[in-house]
Amino acid sequence: MRVSIVLPVADWRACGPAAAAAEAAGFDAVQANEIAHEPFTPLAFAALATERVELVTSVAIAFPRSPMIVANHTWDLARHSKGRFVLGLGTQVRAHNERRFSTPWTAPAARMAEYVQALRAIFRCWETGERLEFAGEHYRFNLMNKEFSPGPNHLKLPAITIAAVGPLMLRNAARYCDGVRLHSFATRAYIEQQVAPMLDRHLAEVGRPRSTFEVSGGGFVATGGTAEEVRQAADKVRYRIAWYASTPAYRTVLQPHGLEALGEKLSVLARQGRFEGIEALIPDEVLELFAAIGPYDRIAERIADRFGGLADTVTIPFPEGADPGAVRQVVRDVQAIPAAYAGHG
């Protein structure tokens, strides 16, 4: 199993050292999230400070950006990292597209499928000189003069993964992408019963072996070197579970466990703006459905129980100031867990 860690994207000066430390600790990838900050620039600093780790956006919000703009970011990061950049894309929800980004909303699965195919066409144009001619319902690209082409990277074309929750986006991932980024708000039962069968079916439809397709995430990890650190990490996860459970769009994740009433109660509090203290509504038995929790010397075992056979890559947050030797050992222990995916190379 592969192990990733999130970069401190709010502090560009810290991104290079953090990525170098992750590489020294044996991590397979570092990732930059797009929440309050854009994810591409932090990875540029990480690229210049490392030689081995993958550099991943997890995820960049797609629709407010033209595929051409994203292609430029991707191409440059791939070039300067010598092929280590992985583009992770997500749609965000309608309200954020329309009200935060002022971006028109259309059927997201169909649009994302077209978005990824447009990116592939742009990549082929730049790498091989193939004429740029892409025409879809949402995007059209047919102008690429030599002056505006960055030219070939002489590398494998950049890998693309997408975030997916529903069946249409999961189908997109299997058909058009190099991997899928599952939502952290997921349980093992939900992935086993609903997500994995869909992915397997759609991969089979296009004749893709599972070893060529990366499944990332699908739950939380909470760990630490002391009982107090584990408790603090678990409480952060508890809050995130409550926050996501308050969103009706994620109610299907609660259904296999008979937790719809909990979701409805949290939705009422969310509509009232009462988020403070909502983590208290998440009992330990619900917390453990969504997360692998334990101290350093047990966390690999918990991750194997929670993610084994389903996920290829997990993201592990460590407490601030964690002992580097302990972190290296956890990474090695998790990497010993079998996984299906063989790598983007």
Q: What kind of feature is each model-predicted range?
A:
Residues 1-345:
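Active-site-adjacent structural elements that line small-molecule/cofactor binding pockets in enzymes
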